[in-house]
A protein has these predicted regions:
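Short glycine-rich, Thr/Ser-proximal phosphate-binding strand/loop in the N-terminal lobe
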Residues: 13-54, 321
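Glycine-rich phosphate-binding loops at beta-strand->alpha-helix junctions
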Residues: 22, 293-311
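N-terminal phosphate-binding loop and adjacent alpha-helix
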Residues: 35-86, 97-99, 103, 218-221, ...
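Glycine-rich phosphate-binding loop plus the immediately following alpha-helix
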Residues: 44-48, 140-240
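Short beta-strand-loop/turn "lid" adjacent to the catalytic site in phosphate-handling enzymes
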Residues: 69-154, 193
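Adenine-nucleotide phosphate-binding core of ATP-dependent small-molecule kinases
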Residues: 240-283
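Glycine-rich phosphate-binding/hydrolytic loop that grips phosphoryl groups
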Residues: 310, 322-345
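Short, low-complexity, charge-dense intrinsically disordered segments
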Residues: 345-359
């Protein structure tokens, strides 16, 4: 990690994390965040519009805003400001998918930072920025040939690999471990003893809970917003009902509870979340993805993280919850570590007279 005291050697760069529905960006010098911005644009816009124009425009605005901010707040002449200006953009997430800027193929697990950095690609998009852009690859697990009878071992990620590198670098996890990322999708990522990404397992649970809240007969029984707190007795009741009757029946039980005037909407949502947690956790334990000897680091929506931690601790699986600030720090650390390694490799190639890989 760069020394905080010697700022002359710290890289100033723009970091980007693009998801399905939004994009986050940070201007950093070394390990310090100078500014952060966001945009409600993601790769879903490309899929919907069948054009990357909105993604390109959002990136152009974010990068331009950072560059303008530096020039505005500094009274130093431009000729003396060179070392304080961003030298490149490093981006992870769906930006490296076919719906992003350019496709960077998934790497086959197991992989660590060395393999990820070696496969990252430098690209140029003059219509967006004159800065070089580093696209970080995602990771896939399972056999190369996907078939219906091996689909249970197949999974993909984009962005979480960078988060995992940061978590390990900062000591938030001690491999072998599992990172549980809870958002629209719930993803369990296994890290081996060397800290490499070994495999992952993703479910649609987050989206299904949201769909139940807004698109099913359960909508009137549940709050419109996502859970802000979990009513633990109701969550545990939902877990028990799922184990007794299955997920679909447990979900319909929310409607029955409403008809019987049992519980507030927020409590019934805790019941539903408990059913999904039990369904997923039991499957992961059965596959030995989760086990007593594996530390679990939980990131994502705070209420869901609290629900999962409670459920895991009840099964004697050690689990800790990372705050949103810690999660952001880990993601940015992962981005920075990968970028610094890529810049070192780029400099080495330049000294040898080789041309860096570029689209």
């Amino acid at each position: 990690m760069s020394s905080r005291a010697d700022t002359s050697k710290e890289v100033c760069a723009i970091y980007v994390d693009m998801g399905t529905t939004n994009t986050r960006a940070w201007l950093m010098r070394g390990s310090r965040v100078i500014a952060r911005l966001g945009s409600p644009v993601g790769v879903r816009d490309t899929a919907r519009d069948r054009s990357p124009q909105k993604v390109h425009a959002a990136l152009r605005e974010l990068i331009g805003a950072f560059q303008a901010q530096i020039k505005t707040v500094s009274s130093t002449p431009a000729s003396k400001l060179k070392s304080g200006l961003p030298v490149c953009v490093a981006a992870a997430g769906m930006i490296g998918s076919p719906l992003g800027l350019a496709e960077v193929p998934h790497l086959q697990a197991p992989v660590g930072m060395a393999e990820i950095a070696a496969a990252a690609q430098w690209v140029q998009f003059p219509e967006i920025t004159d800065l070089p852009i580093l696209l970080i690859p995602g990771v896939r697990s399972g056999p190369a040939a996907v078939k219906f009878d091996t689909i249970h071992t197949t999974d993909v990620m984009r962005g979480e690999e960078t988060l995992c590198i940061g978590l390990a670098s900062l000591g938030y996890i001690q491999p072998p471990a599992v990172v549980l990322n809870l958002g629209s999708h719930w993803k369990a990522i296994q890290l081996d003893a060397e800290g490499r990404i070994e495999s992952s397992s993703t479910s649609l649970s987050g989206e299904l809970v949201h769909a139940a809240q807004s698109q099913t007969i359960l909508a009137s029984a549940l709050p419109e917003d996502r859970a802000s707190v979990i009513a633990e007795p109701w969550m545990k009741a939902g877990m028990r009902e799922q184990r007794r009757s299955g997920l679909a029946r447990a979900a319909f039980s929310v409607r029955l509870l409403q008809l019987a005037n049992q519980g507030a909407p927020e409590e019934r949502l805790s019941f539903l979340i408990g059913a999904f947690v039990a369904s997923e956790m039991d499957a992961l334990i059965a596959r030995r993805v989760l086990a007593e000897e594996k530390q679990v680091a939980i990131v994502g929506i705070p209420a869901l993280a609290a629900a999962w931690r409670s459920a895991l601790m009840a099964m004697s699986v050690p689990a800790s919850v990372l705050s949103p600030a810690e999660t952001e720090d880990a993601l940015l650390t992962g981005l920075r570590c990968i970028l610094e390694k890529c810049l070192t490799m780029k400099d080495t190639k330049a000294r040898k007279g080789e041309k860096p890989s570029r689209r």
